[in-house]
Amino acid sequence: MPGYEIIGKEELREIKDIFDNGGVLFRHGFDHLRNGIYKVNQFEKKFSKKMNTPYALAVTSGTAALRVALAAIEIKPKDEIITQSFTFVATVEAIIESRGIPIITEIDDTLNMDPKDFEKKITKNTKAVIVVHMLGTPARLDEIKKIAKKHKIFLIEDTAWGCGGKYNGIPLGNFGDIGTFSFDFAKTMTTGEGGMVIFKNKKLFKKAAAWHDHGHENNPKLPRWEDSRSSSGFNYRMNELQGAVGIAQLKKLDKVVKGQRKSAKKILSILKKYPLTLRKSPKGSKETFDSLVFFVSNPKLAIRCRNQLLSEGVGTKILPEALTWHFAGSWSHMPQLLKKYGKNIRKKFPKSYSYLNKAVSIPISMNYKNELAKKINTALEKTFKKKI
């Protein structure tokens, strides 16, 4: 949540640096105009260092990051890609756009992929799994990675919500073969729109880098119009303005995550007074706390809780009001899912729906104020009709 909250003079300084040195907004070429200023390239290097991975590729969005990741592993029409029922619609859209077949798993009490259901869904056609760290809480990565390795399938981490988080000391996104990130306006760090893909494997990185730029190899010794091409592709290039903002935002990431964790701790002290159950966090998790999620006893109470929070001026972000955009059981508009799961898609994921239908989320700001605590407390008192 806080990325847009902390945009300031640092971002402006990085942008000004572009216009003070030729004003080139395209990430490649025009060397004679830009005085050595390549913001996207600089952002990629700094991000890869931060995530402790050798390769990083900046793209136009988190959705683009997923599509580029799938292009790198060369999806064929019969290939199946497994992902979870609770995720933003873009995860499944990227699979469909890559010509893959989306296979959906249930979630568990982490609100992330259920490892047991993941293994059940693996077939001879399974090419990869995309695990999503929803709202900043890590999935059960040890179990999921072990299963992926056993069956020799690619592990892709959709880390759109988890930038800055860790699992057993490893940055989220760097646990699998490929990690994807989103920098849209609502994420922990933002470039307005934008994304990043990180790799351990040079071959996968090279494929992705070419594919995201119409197949260009971007040989620095050749003018762009004479550059060789290794494949077909599309245009998912990040521009220099986004790269400049990304550099400034990355410097603030640790401060932001620390602030979110501090705010979450204070809100948790309020939630513990009420008859609700907190979302499970796997052992070894260092969450980003994009949002705090808790469960109440039934769906009607969840709606009541949401309404009370909203009436006090406390947002609930995506649970439960934006569930249709974040639950595969609502996506009957996609022919590929309709063909696989039928019209009553929701009934195919009863465990997931049971969790989500009783869940409420509170978005976390790094700028915690005592007034917010009072509002949350008042809303929960009214919800449960009991003063604590």
Regions found by a protein language model. Name each.
Residues 299-305, 369-374:
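Short, conserved charged micro-motifs
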